[in-house]
Amino acid sequence: MNDSDVFKILLIGDSAVGKTSLLLRFTDPNNFQETSVNMTSVDYKNKNITIDGRTFNLQIWDTAGQERFRTITSSFYRGAHGVLVCYDVTDQLTYNNVGLWMQEIQRYGVLGVSRVLVGNKCDLEDRKLVNASIAQEYADILGIPFIETSATTGVNVEEAFMAMADEIYRNHIGGSKPSVVKPVCGSPPRTKKNIC
Ligand SMILES: Nc1nc2c(ncn2[C@@H]2O[C@H](COP(=O)(O)OP(=O)(O)OP(=O)(O)O)[C@@H](O)[C@H]2O)c(=O)[nH]1
């Protein structure tokens, strides 16, 4: 596998939005246990995926709690192809802070880094505070995919990482595959073609 076939992907967002859970659910779905998430200190995990018949290695990095102290350094962002910016759909503040995380990406990220906006914990329907249409509007303004996920049930987790991989594939490799994302838990798929 060439270096160009490795996609470095970061998970960022406020503390406790479910970044580690998403990472573990995606990379090891059969062994996913919520109880082990808090005890696990993850740096990064790998998973191979296929796009247009070509295999790519996703190297997915977790902040391992550094964001609590706002000590994410520029080295974390170095060489990143894509960033999943995560918030918790039941916690308005984590959504309000998404703009700050976008600024961090601009400040430290490489030019043209791909982004996907992820609203996690969509299984907690009764406690939902962040309206998906507001998040979708924001993502549309930025020209990036938006998707709601649940690391607990697994809903849309694979789709979120695949949307990220598709973005990187198109932006960095020059592939033409459009991201097809099902943004809200249970809504019909949506094709995104107008990414800058
Ligand atoms: N209901 C529900 N709970 C979730 C979901 N994802 C994560 N959680 C819970 O939310 C809490 C925080 O999850 P983490 O995966 O540790 O979140 P994090 O963003 O990595 O947190 P830090 O390590 O502080 O950065 C844990 O108790 C998880 O079990 C989800 O999709 N639904």
Swiss-Prot record:
GO cellular component terms, A-Z: lipid droplet; plasma membrane
Entry keyword set: Cell membrane, GTP-binding, Lipoprotein, Membrane, Nucleotide-binding, Prenylation
Keyword Protein biosynthesis attached: no
Binding sites annotated in the UniProt record for GTP: 13-20, 62-66, 120-123
Gene3D superfamilies: P-loop containing nucleotide triphosphate hydrolases (3.40.50.300)
Membrane topology classification: Lipid-anchor
Lipid addition sites, S-geranylgeranyl cysteine: 196
Chain location of the short sequence motif Effector region per the record: 36-44
Protein name: Ras-related protein RabG1
Protein's organism: Dictyostelium discoideum
